[in-house]
Amino acid sequence: MKYDNLLDRFIKYVKVNTRSDPDSETTPSTESQEAFALTILKPEMEAIGLQDVHYNPVNGYLIGTLPANNPTLTRKIGFIAHMDTADFNADNVNPQIIDNYQGGDITLGSSNYKLDPKAFPNLNNYIGQTLITTDGTTLLGADDKSGIAEIMTAIEFLTSQPQIEHCDIKVAFGPDEEIGVGADKFEVADFEVDFAYTMDGGPLGELQYETFSAAALEVTFLGRNVHPGTAKDQMINALQLAIDFHEKLPAKERPEYTDGYQGFYHLTGLTGTVEEARASYIIRDFEEASFEARKVKVENIAQSMNAQLGTKRVLVELNDQYYNMKKVIEKDMTAIELAKEVMEELTIKPVIEPIRGGTDGSKISFMGIPTPNIFAGGENMHGRFEFVSLQTMERAVDVIIGLVCKA
């Protein structure tokens, strides 16, 4: 009974295209996210017994409350998941359900793609389980619709079993996490909890309270275009300036060469002509000092190139995006200790590792609500090879229920 609607709920959610748009200036960045909140999630939240369900058109958050049914459970706990999906095709998501996976390749629909354990050895962790995959033409959207489905399923179970005592619970579904702005307008006053959890992690047992600190870097290169036949000592090729700039960054400090606590510079876009070029980067690191040092390094490279060119032709624009939430959460580890205790009681081994990324919890933690991250089940996220285990999603439901009953 506890999990009866989990799979159907998840399938229903992922079939709705809620891809966010980094170029949009609206909140949410796409109309489909608001429609998803208002036409699908809000009625369902009300139907399963959440109270004071309301949508804030200013920040795109849909919030509901389940009051405590035991006055001695005085903590207030929140659960957060994001509605948008990543920058990959999300039109006509057509999930495949693989019952009792027995190993080997999984053909993704009628496409030429397959999930191969040689390329994706994480498949070997799911022998005997029910896997939900893509058909090879889209992402799946388990990031983070598995989190939404898990929260909904846990609430539905609690309201159907009033004899199960629980604390005050707040639920929030928000927009635009994948483009890094989802929590920018989050209203703490509308989410009065002692701490919260984003249900936005990956495999079973993930419990995370360290994220990258993150910055966006835009570098504009100003060239001088003349006819290539008479270009000697006159032409300044903006594209070549971009190449020179990139080559001055440490070659081994890129995502493809780093892991664990190592930071990186990541070139995400390069456009331009001889006259003008633009390079987009993201900068990531865990430690505050090394994060700041990376930003200083790119400024110094630009200054050095401009000095050599004799004029300002390399223009740097740096914007911090979010910070490592460890700085906030380690001041009071209650949320982590509670989650560890609940997982261990459920015979789930907590896997406490840094997130090589960020969550909405990064920003929300700095707003005053410690918000670590818990597994939601997704694997190979953000692309056609994404999949999720139904059994892992069920365990996430168990963790949510355990947290609110133990609070």
From Swiss-Prot:
SUPFAM superfamilies per record: Bacterial exopeptidase dimerisation domain (SSF55031), Zn-dependent exopeptidases (SSF53187)
Keywords: Aminopeptidase, Cytoplasm, Hydrolase, Metal-binding, Metalloprotease, Protease, Zinc
Pfam families referenced in this protein's UniProt entry, alphabetically: M20_dimer, Peptidase_M20
Any one GO CC term of the record: cytosol
Cofactor: Zn(2+)
Residues the record marks as active site: 84, 177
EC number: 3.4.11.4
Cell compartments where the protein resides: Cytoplasm
Co-factor remark: Binds 2 Zn(2+) ions per subunit.
Binding locations of Zn(2+) 1: 82, 143, 200
Gene Ontology annotations of biological process type: peptide catabolic process; proteolysis
Class of this enzyme: hydrolase
A GO MF label: tripeptide aminopeptidase activity
Superkingdom of origin organism: Bacteria
Protein name: Peptidase T
